[in-house]
């Protein structure tokens, strides 16, 4: 009987396959997304130097103040996207390469991307 690969292993394979093809630079960094069951994280990475330029997540106190008590997971993800776009703008970054890290472009990942685009980040 064949062993069935888990969804996490499949996502990890997709992530590695995509990371071979896309890289971020100082002018056009990689917008990386990580999604857990409870939180969502986004960071801008310059792969040439191996440096994280800025990051945003649901753990930040500024985001908790902005949202108050509600919003749901998708609303919170959109707010994280808006926050990462604002931080990128303050660094003078207009364009990014979107790295969804093997996740489907749906739900929270899509909401984060739309939030970043709404604040003027291009990808």
Swiss-Prot record:
Alphabetical list of Pfam families matching this protein: Ribosomal_L18p
Keywords noted in UniProt: Ribonucleoprotein, Ribosomal protein, RNA-binding, rRNA-binding
InterPro entries: Ribosomal_uL18_bac-type, Ribosomal_uL18_bac/euk
GO molecular function: 5S rRNA binding; structural constituent of ribosome
GO biological process: translation
Keyword Membrane among UniProt keywords: no
Assigned GO CC terms: cytosolic large ribosomal subunit
UniProt entry tagged with the keyword Ribonucleoprotein: yes
NCBIfam families reported in the protein's UniProt record: L18_bact
Xref: PANTHER family: 39S RIBOSOMAL PROTEIN L18, MITOCHONDRIAL (PTHR12899), LARGE RIBOSOMAL SUBUNIT PROTEIN UL18M (PTHR12899:SF3)
Subunit structure of this chain's protein: Part of the 50S ribosomal subunit; part of the 5S rRNA/L5/L18/L25 subcomplex. Contacts the 5S and 23S rRNAs.
Family note: Belongs to the universal ribosomal protein uL18 family.
Free-text function comment from the UniProt entry: This is one of the proteins that bind and probably mediate the attachment of the 5S RNA into the large ribosomal subunit, where it forms part of the central protuberance.
Name of the featured protein: Large ribosomal subunit protein uL18
Organism this protein belongs to: Desulforudis audaxviator (strain MP104C)
Lineage, opening ranks: Bacteria, Bacillati, Bacillota, Clostridia, Thermoanaerobacterales
Gene: rplR
């Amino acid at each position: 009987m064949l062993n069935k690969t888990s969804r996490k292993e499949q996502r990890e394979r997709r992530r590695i396959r995509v990371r071979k093809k896309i890289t971020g630079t100082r002018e056009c960094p990689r917008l990386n997304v990580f999604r857990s069951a409870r939180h969502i994280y986004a960071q801008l990475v310059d792969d040439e130097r191996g440096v994280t330029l800025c990051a945003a997540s649901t753990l930040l106190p500024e985001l908790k103040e902005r949202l108050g008590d509600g919003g749901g997971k998708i609303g919170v993800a959109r707010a994280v996207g808006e926050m990462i776009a604002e931080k990128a703008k303050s660094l003078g970054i207009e364009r990014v390469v979107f790295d969804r890290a093997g996740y489907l472009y749906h739900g929270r990942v899509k909401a984060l991307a739309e939030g970043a685009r709404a604040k003027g980040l291009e990808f």
